[in-house]
């Protein structure tokens, strides 16, 4: 039957009345071998055999009924991963899986035009000069990427996806709240990436009368020679400090945005992989593209500040228009347009992790959602991304700034709670995690402390945030335009609240 095979036991040995039926499976007990040597997961079902032809026919019909849905059959045919949020056992790991794979994946995901566009916000939105923008980019990127590298170690050690791991770190209830937020974040990142690519594609061939409409769209080689780049004036004072904090919040949000994805991409590494090697390889893989792209974006923006023509392109199509101005007119012309298309396509590398993790996060929200194949969640996530990206194209600057800051807020809270649990209550030891409890509500931490910390931290964020739609009472005290300290207040309030309540949760509930 293609996907089904049968083996009859010798009736001269014990348990000879058992018949073994092998069918592909993504649930229950699995083993990664197949009778034809393919990579199909198989489930063994034992049935009593009366050695009659009728029973053989019944076994065949029963096995056919247990075959995979057509989605998973297709995924199996394409050699795609179909495993859900269940822990990845040591026997399922890939002995050839290298830290270079994870490091290069994050390198590709961040060497994209969205990071470049974010760097341009420093001079264009926050009125910072190039030197100040570079310092902010380096410091806040380091602050944001360290949790990503650190939580990647957990995936290799425990074999748990990040949102399932969160049940141990945040508590069961809190983890499901963050799983929902993570689904929203996956779509949001996809929108941000798609928007800036659409803006760039919109500029290609725009002088020929055949420009690509904005909704359908879904590097500086000559700055020094053109004399359009300058460092800008060094300024100080409360207003500059406020702008530094606000730009830093956006940078931090971009860098740390992968924190709730981290363990998803190391679960197939052998457990004995050197943990220091994982950490520092990922730090390198994350830091270089983030530094390079954002600093390049800041330099490009400084050129727009000094050149009226470039500024006009920027005003028309934001960073996409500015990139076109640098690469095409009076520069590389046709080849420059080709480069613009390549840059726009870099979005694919950034969106792959989003659409991979969105399915795992959706399944982690609720048990019933785990029964829906991952491919369905991924398709739904892509559809939502397109639907939101189209209107967001026309309001990119405000959307990107607000979204990045919002991501930074909730991830700072997540990191503060998770690190508290691991270092204080689990004594920085992986031996204090019982992986078998991953889906047992009676044994997992309830999440009282985590939920309380999240709620209290939200008030801290509200007091410290500085957005076009809301300026907190504390943030408005910093400079003329306010300074965003929402993620700092959120993290600190979450840490304090969690460590006040968590001991009582352990004392009275024992978990």
Predicted regions and their residues:
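Hydrophobic transmembrane alpha-helices that form the core helical bundles
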Residues: 175-210, 344, 348-364
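Transmembrane helix-loop boundary segments of multi-pass membrane transporters
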Residues: 123-135, 204-216, 335-339, 369-380, ...
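TM-loop-TM module centered on a large, flexible mid-protein loop between adjacent transmembrane helices
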Residues: 296-350, 368, 389-397, 401-405
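Transmembrane helix-boundary motif of multi-pass solute transporters/channels
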Residues: 70-170, 174, 260-269, 273-287, ...
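Loop-to-transmembrane helix boundary motifs in multi-pass membrane proteins
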Residues: 213-216, 348, 364-397, 439-461
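Membrane-interface "cap" regions at the ends of multi-pass membrane proteins
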Residues: 3-130, 221-225, 243-249, 267-277
